[in-house]
Amino acid sequence: METTLRAALIAWLRADPALPDMLNDIHEEAPPAASLPWLQIAASASADWSMKDRRGREIRIAIELHARGDDPAETGAMARAIEQRIAAMPPALPGCRIANIIFLRARAEQRAGHRRAVLIEHRFRLIEDRQPMENRP
């Protein structure tokens, strides 16, 4: 489910009408060659969140915005747009559904060379759509 969610999240962010105008790249990993600003999945981890009759996963995904500039308000506006887009992600995914999406934390920092980075972490809880666990081979 984690791989499915990561791919769906990147596709959802890329499909936003405004984000591609703000960012030069939205990539699952660090893009091989992209000028700032760009967005990547920095890390993800999953744990069991199964129910009595369905498999489930709790998946934490940290995405990182990389930008350049002296004005933190500009990077902050991009981070808010990203957070809003993630919160609006539709629940249906191939083979599972998102039960909920919770913002966990964000961290912003100024880096050398007028670079800025914002790490945004969300928790996704997913439930498998397929047949109940007791009916599985």
Feature locations, PLM:
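Short, cysteine-centered beta-strand-loop-beta hairpins and adjacent loop/turn segments enriched
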Residues: D48-M51, G69-P72, I127-E134
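Oligomerization/assembly interface segments of phage tail-like spikes and tubes
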Residues: R55-G69, R116-I127
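Small/polar-rich, solvent-exposed N-terminal microdomains that initiate assembly or binding
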Residues: M1-M51, A81, M89-L93, E134-P137
